């Protein structure tokens, strides 16, 4: 019985002495793990979170943020505006989040913006 032909490993092309390594840009990753942990400790001081669960929460927050930002951007473009205002963010929240969750988040955001602008 004949053995299957073995493939030779591919060799990388050799570099000239004057040629430099090409560095790839690392994709920027925004992490909110610290803030998730701070909120967890405010709400439930006696509960911890595993690193795997923290990674999932971080991905979830980044995903929601990305979706809200792109939806708000789309709304600004539809209205021929070059600036995303709180109104676009609020509308994006209403479009992306379901019913009661959207109402709750809009009221919380309004409260936070009011607190921020009053300087308290």
Swiss-Prot record:
Keyword annotations: Acetylation, Chromosome, DNA condensation, DNA-binding, Isopeptide bond, Nucleosome core, Nucleus, Ubl conjugation
Post-translational modifications: Can be acetylated to form H2BK6ac, H2BK33ac and H2BK34ac. Monoubiquitinated to form H2BK143ub1; may give a specific tag for epigenetic transcriptional activation.
UniProt main location, coarse: nucleus
Residue span of region Disordered: 1-26
GO MF term set: DNA binding; protein heterodimerization activity; structural constituent of chromatin
A GO cellular component annotation in the UniProt record: nucleosome
N6-acetyllysine sites (modified residues): 7, 10-11
Claim: DNA-binding is one of the keywords in the record: yes
Keyword Secreted in record: no
CDD domains membership: HFD_H2B
Family per record: Belongs to the histone H2B family.
Oligomer status and interactors: The nucleosome is a histone octamer containing two molecules each of H2A, H2B, H3 and H4 assembled in one H3-H4 heterotetramer and two H2A-H2B heterodimers. The octamer wraps approximately 147 bp of DNA.
Protein name from the UniProt record: Histone H2B
Lineage: Eukaryota, Viridiplantae, Streptophyta, Embryophyta, Tracheophyta
């Amino acid at each position: 019985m004949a053995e299957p032909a073995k493939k030779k490993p591919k060799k990388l092309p050799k570099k000239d002495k004057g040629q430099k390594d090409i560095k790839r840009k690392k994709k920027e990753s925004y992490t909110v793990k610290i803030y998730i942990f701070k909120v967890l400790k405010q709400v439930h001081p006696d509960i911890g979170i595993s690193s795997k669960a923290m990674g999932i929460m971080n991905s979830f927050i980044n995903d929601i943020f990305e979706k809200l930002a792109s939806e708000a951007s789309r709304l600004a473009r539809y209205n021929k505006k070059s600036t995303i205002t709180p109104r676009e963010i609020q509308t994006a929240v209403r479009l992306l989040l379901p019913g009661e969750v959207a109402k709750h988040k809009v009221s919380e955001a309004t409260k936070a913006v009011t607190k921020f602008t009053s300087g308290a």
